Amino acid sequence: MTIILKNKHSLEVDDFKFKCCVGKNGISKEKIEGDNKTPKGNFKLEKLYYRSDRLNKPFTKLKCVKINKNMGWCNNIKDNANYNKLVNTKKKTKHEKLYRKDFKYDLIIPIKYNWQGRKLGKGSCIFLHLTKNYKPTAGCIALSKKDFLIMLKLISTRTKIKIF
């Protein structure tokens, strides 16, 4: 199955169309760290990370990982070893915290953009995550909790996302 994002407001999964939002500066083939753009292309999905203190384990065929207080995603363009990877927040490297006070990362699926042949500065922390108000993101794709939970029931470890 392929998740399709044809425009910045609609995510298609099987026969479902979900309202969504993307990066503040739209969708682009040319992506750099901090440009607020959602990367264009075909990508695999990582496992589901979720806040078990706020949600029960969702039904999905994806591998599920509980988010803890020490989880982050490295966005340090000078850290070749950890850039665009899951890191322990106790490491002395710049990162996006996954354990947040707000709800946005209660459910996240990292999109495997800039994973293989990782290039420093080409963008990191590109996730599917939650939103309530559909305000543009820093480059991620966000949808409502209700829609995210429906999507989780439909996708599997072989699902890809096509962004164009």
Describe every region a protein language model picked out.
Residues 143:
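A conserved hydrophobic position in a structured secondary element of the catalytic/binding core
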Residues 1-138, 146-164:
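Cell wall/extracellular polymer interaction/catalysis modules
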